[in-house]
Amino acid sequence: MVSGPLALRWCAWAGRGDMGPDMELPSHSKQLLLQLNQQRTKGFLCDVIIMVENSIFRAHKNVLAASSIYFKSLVLHDNLINLDTDMVSSTVFQQILDFIYTGKLLPSDQPAEPNFSTLLTAASYLQLPELAALCRRKLKRAGKPFGSGRAGSTGMGRPPRSQRLSTASVIQARYQGLVDGRKGAHAPQELPQAKGSDDELFLGGSNQDSVQGLGRAVCPAGGEAGLGGCSSSTNGSSGGCEQELGLDLSKKSPPLPPATPGPHLTPDDAAQLSDSQHGSPPAASAPPVANSASYSELGGTPDEPMDLEGAEDNHLSLLEAPGGQPRKSLRHSTRKKEWGKKEPVAGSPFERREAGPKGPCPGEEGEGVGDRVPNGILASGAGPSGPYGEPPYPCKEEEENGKDASEDSAQSGSEGGSGHASAHYMYRQEGYETVSYGDNLYVCIPCAKGFPSSEQLNAHVETHTEEELFIKEEGAYETGSGGAEEEAEDLSAPSAAYTAEPRPFKCSVCEKTYKDPATLRQHEKTHWLTRPFPCNICGKMFTQRGTMTRHMRSHLGLKPFACDECGMRFTRQYRLTEHMRVHSGEKPYECQLCGGKFTQQRNLISHLRMHTSPS
């Protein structure tokens, strides 16, 4: 099945003589939409996740980008998108997603008037003009107001003139500030006027006093999306846009910024805007909504007409902005990494190490789930049980990963916070990004070095095992008839006394030494009392972004590394490398004492402990 921009162009050409030749099969576009919807319901080739309240929706980037300019600007930079719950709920977004993939408004349990009014608000927020026009026609046929009304009436009444003017001032001020604050920014195409259409200037809702969405349509990526723009993450003072493609959960939307009055507002308008913002009730948390059933399961056939009259052929034809040019994205240049710049608490380890090594610089930890991972909508009520305690419900992260020695040591250094992590088998990588080894398919697990052949890997592994044996022998000579507990401590102790490599970097808390500052910083995080990276799903706290990202993969079921032989998928690349040896029958790890061979390095390490144990 074709899934990509080319497929969407075929779909958009249905019945359009100006974009391409007439189709031989008039139902081709419907069949294509049917296949795409079935892929979505099964989670096949889905490369973006939309989170609304407590619900998770999987979709395809190209389908969303072809349906909405708003989504088109978001999916270029984000793979995990949070929508504003004041503007769209999970139930309404379920209907919108079904409409995008099927062209039909599926039946709902809600009455007609609130349903279409809420849909109109959400469609205007997400910039779906066809759906907004359809909702207006439905409301007009029912005789319900959607664009005008008294100031105090409920429903879809138009805001009073003072609110519309203040709204236009806020939008213009924010838009101008974004353009002026960005280096080399082009001139804006056109500023919105106070007399714009209903869905361009202000977003009507069931509660007319909710002006928070009127002054700004907040992009989940941290920018202002009311003009179809989205922010682009910048590092420090650089103004370049980071464009990350592929399913990478390292990019996470920051918290929604509060709306601040612009310079064009009068004091009365500013007070009115502030009161209306604080008076807007928060959206109720809806139960999780699973992905809808496929088009065929919902009773629709490929030959049924779509609800969108006159727009069936182009409801997915928004791949490009007017004029054939893609709209430019705007991002704040002030999105910086701030969690390392907090004021130190009196008596904390931060204050004790003021003269020592500084915290990690921005960018040294690799890509993360955000500059500062917020306690999002899913983290409310799901935090730890105590100030630094464990979450009230356990996570099942280790079900797929296993509880092997190598990964336990890596997790203990970043999550345990006890300072007794094994420094001998700790990962040396700063970020969570998996290294592309190329032809070096034979990977040493503790140090993550790749080798092109098993012979070179064996020679490298010998340096690890010989050093370990030497440590154990020295410990046995010093302790005489010491027990197994003392020898285990020798194994986990730093190997500075037995190696020729200098270790000039010393921990200011526990006096351990390391050979490079990056490893020292990673170790020092285990002494920190704060864990600034929470999981937005279960509330578990982490000291590193990379560890939290791997943890979130277990919640979302993301396994990006697939085996070409059997199709089995894994969350980590080294797991896939180990799995491939099952198909090849290769056992690259050999014991130098008895000649036994193993497919995994941790099995060899356990085997060596059997040789060196006193029993």
Curated annotation (Swiss-Prot):
Modification Phosphoserine, positions: 166, 169, 197, 348, 412
Can you say where in the cell this protein is located? Nucleus
Q: Which InterPro entries match?
A: BTB/POZ_dom, SKP1/BTB/POZ_sf, Znf_C2H2_sf, Znf_C2H2_type
Q: Which UniProt keywords apply?
A: DNA-binding, Metal-binding, Nucleus, Phosphoprotein, Repeat, Repressor, Transcription, Transcription regulation, Zinc, Zinc-finger
- Enumerate the residue ranges forming zinc fingers (C2H2-type): 442-469, 505-532, 533-560, 561-588, 589-615
Q: Where is this region: Binding to CtBP?
A: 246-250
- Superkingdom, natural source: Eukaryota
In terms of Pfam families, this protein maps to: BTB, zf-C2H2
A GO molecular function held by the record: zinc ion binding
Region listing for Disordered, in residue ranges: 144-167, 182-208, 229-421
Q: Name one GO biological process term.
A: regulation of cytokine production
An example of a Gene Ontology cellular component annotation for this protein is:
plasma membrane
Q: Composition bias, kind Basic and acidic residues: at what positions?
A: 336-356
- Record's compositionally biased regions (Low complexity): 280-296, 379-388
Q: Describe the location of the BTB domain by residue ranges.
A: 46-109
Q: In which tissues is it expressed?
A: Highest levels in cerebellum.
What do we know about how this protein assembles, alone or with others?
Self-associates. Interacts with HIC1.
> What is the role of this chain?
Transcriptional repressor.
Q: Which family does it belong to?
A: Belongs to the krueppel C2H2-type zinc-finger protein family. Hic subfamily.
* Name of this protein: Hypermethylated in cancer 2 protein
